[in-house]
């Protein structure tokens, strides 16, 4: 049987391969609502969301999009019920251990950004192992923002630069946007060209606040576990229909 996924295995013909976003960021919103609509525990929505993420990552590789950054766990998410937080930490570790060999084979390089030192020790070890195992891969740069907060990232960068000024290693007038960006978690990444947020919500939720100064934003009226290649196709159609001015006329 032909499915929508097989129909969209290759880049759709109505998309210009030369005008694809180089770097896509995603806020994977709606897992809990997806589960509630089906009378399932919220954690089952997170489990279903993993499948949607795997498919998006495959799609980026198939369609020639070189970088994907996703918002997996924010600094504010610790306020969720303890059982849900514990489930998410265990889920991250399980997915890393289970999917690592496939990521290596598929050429995916995985990075984690955020306040990683505050994560459980076993998860930190899994993260370190996955990043080391995929460091040489070049097919897709897959970045997972975990225990990440955009404001805290900016504060941390300010503190680092302030300490350099205090110690005499840096003059205040030497600080510019380029130097500041080198002190962010994402210093090895280009800024996102396109942000996709699912579930219809229209806010940034403290995500990549510095990096998305000129990012195109697309809000998908679909819950994250239902975000598929057809939905991604629609996002890319919208992106290619825009003229990016970067402040110019």
From Swiss-Prot:
It comes from the Bacteria. Substrate binds at residues 30-34, 42, 46, 74-76, 78, 80, 197, 203-205. Binds 2 magnesium ions per subunit. It holds the Pfam family Prenyltransf. This is Isoprenyl transferase. Mg(2+) binds at residues 29, 216. GO terms for molecular function: magnesium ion binding; prenyltransferase activity. Its cofactor is Mg(2+). Keywords: Magnesium, Metal-binding, Transferase. Catalyzes the condensation of isopentenyl diphosphate (IPP) with allylic pyrophosphates generating different type of terpenoids. NCBIfam families: PRK14830.1, PRK14831.1, uppS. Its EC number is 2.5.1.-. It is an enzyme of class 2 (transferase). Homodimer. One of its GO terms (biological process) is polyprenol biosynthetic process. The keyword Cell inner membrane does not apply. Belongs to the UPP synthase family. It comes from Gloeobacter violaceus (strain ATCC 29082 / PCC 7421). InterPro entries: UPP_synth-like, UPP_synth-like_CS, UPP_synth-like_sf. SUPFAM superfamilies: Undecaprenyl diphosphate synthase. Gene3D superfamilies: Decaprenyl diphosphate synthase-like. The active site is at residues 29, 77.
């Amino acid at each position: 049987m032909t499915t929508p996924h097989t129909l969209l295995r290759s880049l759709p013909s109505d998309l210009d391969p030369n005008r694809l976003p180089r770097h896509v960021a995603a806020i994977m919103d709606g897992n809990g609502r997806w589960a509630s609509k089906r009378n399932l525990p919220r954690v089952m929505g997170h489990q279903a969301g993993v499948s949607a993420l795997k498919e998006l990552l495959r799609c980026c590789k198939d369609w020639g999009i070189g970088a994907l950054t996703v918002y997996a766990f924010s600094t504010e998410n610790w306020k969720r019920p303890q059982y849900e937080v514990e489930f998410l930490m265990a889920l991250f570790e399980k997915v890393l251990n289970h999917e690592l060999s496939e990521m290596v084979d598929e050429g995916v390089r995985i990075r984690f950004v955020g306040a990683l030192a505050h994560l459980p020790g076993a998860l930190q070890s899994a993260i370190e192992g996955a990043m080391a195992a995929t460091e040489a891969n070049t097919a897709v740069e897959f970045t997972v923002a975990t225990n990440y907060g955009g404001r805290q990232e900016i504060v941390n960068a300010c503190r680092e630069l302030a300490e350099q000024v205090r110690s005499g290693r840096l003059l205040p007038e030497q600080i510019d946007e380029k130097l500041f960006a080198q002190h962010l978690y994402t210093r090895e990444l280009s800024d996102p060209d396109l942000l996709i947020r699912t579930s219809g919500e229209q806010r940034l939720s403290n995500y990549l606040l510095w990096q998305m100064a000129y990012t195109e934003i697309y809000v998908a009226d679909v819950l994250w576990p239902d975000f598929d290649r057809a939905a991604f196709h629609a996002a890319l159609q919208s992106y290619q229909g825009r003229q990016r001015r970067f402040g110019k006329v």
